[in-house]
Amino acid sequence: MSLPSANPAHLDTTNLHELFRDLVDFPSVSQQEGPLADAVEAVLREVNGLQVDRIGNSVVARTDLGRPERVLIAGHLDTVPIVDNLPSHVHTVDGEEYLVGRGTCDMKGGVAVALYLASHLHEPNRDLTFVFYEAEEIAAEHNGLGKIAAARSDLLHADLAILMEPTDGVVEGGCQGTMRFTLDVAGQAAHSARSWKGRNAIHRLLPILQILSDWQQHDPHVLVEGLRFREGLNATMLQAGVAGNVIAPSAKIQINYRFAPDKTAAQARTAMEELFADWPMTVLDLSSPARPGLDQPLATSFVAAVGSQPGPKYGWTDVARFSELGIPALNFGPGDPMYAHKDDECCRLASLDEALAALVTWLDQDDVIKLAGEGGRP
């Protein structure tokens, strides 16, 4: 277990919007989350009634009120690399204020809501577990949720998990799986002036490209538990050629398959192996999808509290990790996911208030929390 630094930076949870800005202006690129984890841990240890544990640079805080149900609320502390987009600044568009900067959308808005809720919600109608974890944006082997599950899976026990991914305040059920793989195409080198002496591996990619092109013509939509997912099969990278006057002796194409949760990871892999049976395949990564699970009673009641029509999560998120643990999970948080990872990443400030209000309404504690909407602007 990692210990907090002797003098962690202070995060003031009095005002939601100011807390949000402080979190954003606290750099925490993947594998550099330690100081922010220290600050988050310090906040949580000051809250009466929370049992706090730390594993690496992930922090877990739990209530123990004896409620019959437990809800887990999770958000990752890390961001993708900074590109001259910190410190943050406020930008107004059509009367709406946005905080602009790295991590605003993905996902320090969600982290701010969760940390504010943990600091102010003292008598929820369900026991709560808050998880602030490291390394979501990089390879799965570093993922904080995975490390917690390996070291202390009991900390993740819950009847429902809410992952505070940016969904623009809409509940998004489940997530699609993802498979990345390469196909190798062999050729034979020759001088380009005598090309007939060789075999051009780049040209021999054509059948693969034709399969990909033909695949785009079919309906990519898959209905799962009432939600309409959209699959994708796309070439994403290509490696070929040794010199401008040499016929390419080999080529390697990378393909990404995004598949709906009506199939397992194993079924998705089999489908790709059959589709591209004529070429050697190397699987780079394969992540399972998660079914929506919105028919579960807790999820149904939360969707009702949010009050909007739920949708599917097209990308892969850590709800799949909870699904593998047998825990129903959904995505819900402030921020438009279209802005995630962009250089001008931003989040509408009012979306934090809206997300907080939905959670408070569902947890039946309207009178306990004073929302940050009044005087909450940074």
Residue ranges of predicted features:
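N-terminal helical capping/dimerization or prosegment-like subdomains
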Residues: 2-77, 82, 250-256, 271-274, ...
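Metal-dependent amide/peptide-bond hydrolase catalytic core
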Residues: 2-4, 11, 166, 173-174, ...
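Buried hydrophobic packing segments
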Residues: 40, 111-121, 145-148, 205-208, ...
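Short secondary-structure junctions
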Residues: 46-54, 90-91, 278-282, 307-311
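Generic recognition of long tandem-repeat/solenoid scaffolds
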Residues: 59-63, 94-101, 281
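Active-site metal-coordination/substrate-binding segment of hydrolases
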Residues: 70-132, 144
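Acidic/histidine-rich catalytic neighborhood of metal-dependent amide-processing enzymes
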Residues: 112-180
